Amino acid sequence: MSTATFVDIIIAILLPPLGVFLRFGCGVEFWICLVLTLLGYIPGIIYAIYVLTK
């Protein structure tokens, strides 16, 4: 795991959509993460970490 990935994961824990946005831009991953975060903070975190580490 690189330092950039580690920083992305820390950002994803604090603000899940921001972490995904910084990596993928305004793509489908961002919108899925945003919806999951609005429905519940924990699902947004789980999805963000999953997407950032795959």
Curated annotation (Swiss-Prot):
It is found in: Membrane. It holds the Pfam family Pmp3. It is a multi-pass membrane protein. Induction: By low temperature. Also promoted by abscisic acid (ABA) and dehydration but is not a general response to stress conditions. One of its GO terms (biological process) is response to abscisic acid. Keywords: Membrane, Transmembrane, Transmembrane helix. The keyword Transmembrane applies. PANTHER family: HYDROPHOBIC PROTEIN RCI2 LOW TEMPERATURE AND SALT RESPONSIVE PROTEIN LTI6 -RELATED, HYDROPHOBIC PROTEIN RCI2A. Belongs to the UPF0057 (PMP3) family. This is Hydrophobic protein RCI2A.
